[in-house]
Amino acid sequence: MASILVGSILGTVKDQLVQSFSAHSPRGRRGWRWAIWITLVSVLVLLVVSEVVIRRAGPILKGRVIETLSSRFDSKVELDDLQVSILRGLQVSGKGLRIFPPDDVVAAGAKNPLIAVQDFNFHAGLIGLFLKPMHVGVVHVQGLAINIPPRQMRGQGAKKSRHEGKIKILVDEIVCNDSRLVIDTANPDKDPKIFELEHIVLHDVGPNAPWPYDAKLTNAVPKGEIHAAGTFGPWNTESPGDSTVTGHYTFDHADLNPIKGIGGILSSVGDFKGQLDRIEVQGTAEVPKFTLDTANYPMPLYTKFSAVVDGTSGDTYLQPVEAKLGQSQFTCSGAVVNVKGQGHTVDLDIDVPAGRIQDFLQLAVKTEPVVMTGVLEMKTKLHIPPGKQSVSQKLGMKGNFTLKQIHFTNPELEDKVDMLSLRAQGKPKEAKPGAEDVHSRMTGRFQMGEGKLDLQDLNYAMPGATVRLAGVYTLDGKKFDFTGKVRTEAKLSQMVASRWKSWALKVADPFFHKNGAGAEIPVKVTGTNGSPKFGLDIGRRDSKQ
């Protein structure tokens, strides 16, 4: 191409000079003859130099790129192709750039390149080719992949003194599209931690200083856009996972609905710092209309959290999270654990010091209105295993609770509880529908899973009586099935208003008067939330007799 260009230019120059030469006198022609030859020789020299520059620029720059990167990362560097053009300054494009881990890390088993680039290009002034170091304004990168080997591999080789070679190229800014950061793990039960970076810009890229960056990525689950800005580096050559990273992030409009069993739009902001292997995060998150599919009742959920992301395992440790559901505040701590090929397991310890039971029932139980209101104290362990099932079906909880100031929203059930309290105190004449609500307290152990709530050692105390129950309550509100005993202060004969019924029951008093109680009566609660049935469980008592 250069030869054709040289021939064309020389031919054109010659034709123009010959025309001018023919128009002058013989004496003038001798002067023009010399001018023609001097011009032709000058043009020829210029074009020969240009052709040499074009031919040599590629190898020169390829050598500089490899030498600069090899010096910076202290490792082997490969570059498949480098193309150079000088028609509009110095334009460079390359393909297949690979930077490998240090030799001792490769010997320990690291096989993938530490850094791989599909394509890159940059533009610089032509004079820069002859300067050392060469200055480049912006480098555009497509398909950047960074693979951080497991910490165990990075620790195999002894640390050695680095030879700081001369940097042959200085870059102001690197613009990367479609990048991926992979932090590998040596644990066979874990998947590597992967960050997909849609767009990232690195500023002031120097060898021994942090690089300011601005990044944008689309989170897969829940799907939403994350924007982060901060600093990265300096790059730790011996152990890349220990390279420092800091920043501030925003996570907007993350749709929870594709996650089976839950719904809502998540937003989060926060700050992070640490190393690639271990990043500390502090932030807030909110879902104004959070739902579980067992109820589909939207509840506002807000959290303030502190977490550690372990890049070596892919696990996230929460320590702790301050949360608010509706008007109920609680804390939780625990871990989101990476399970190879399956997803994550969530294990949390939850502490509700003084919440509202109605907030939790509205979220989880498909009944309107909720069964009861009251003040909830609860300590529980929450477990969500990986899998494709609905979160509500996978969700498991186990713990204990205390309920105070209980009020049943079903008027019929509340009346029965209030009248039971009055009869148990020996005030049967006051036991009428619409009686004043009694102050009651409930404690117990529970286990929730597979869409049902299993209650054990349920102790319901009210003036004049204590109710001890155990049984199952389905979260869809379609089934109550509890059995137990009511222990009262009054005897059976003292619980009825009719005098003749009272005399008749005196015969039965000795059979129910036991263990220090006026009466101990077997009871059952069955039915549904809309139609509960509260009555004696005489058959069960008879079978035990």
Model segments located where?
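Membrane-proximal interfacial segments on either side of biological membranes
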Residues: 68-72, 129-134, 141-142, 146-149, ...
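N-terminal type II signal-anchor transmembrane helix
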Residues: 2-74
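Short beta-strand segments that buttress and anchor functional surface loops
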Residues: 96-99, 213-220, 319-325, 456-462, ...
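Residue-level detector of beta-strand structural context in well-folded domains
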Residues: 75, 82, 90, 95, ...
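Terminal hydrophobic membrane-targeting helix
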Residues: 47-150
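Generic long, charged, amphipathic alpha-helical segments
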Residues: 439-443
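Extended serine/threonine-enriched, polar tracts that run as long, contiguous segments within proteins
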Residues: 446-454, 458-470
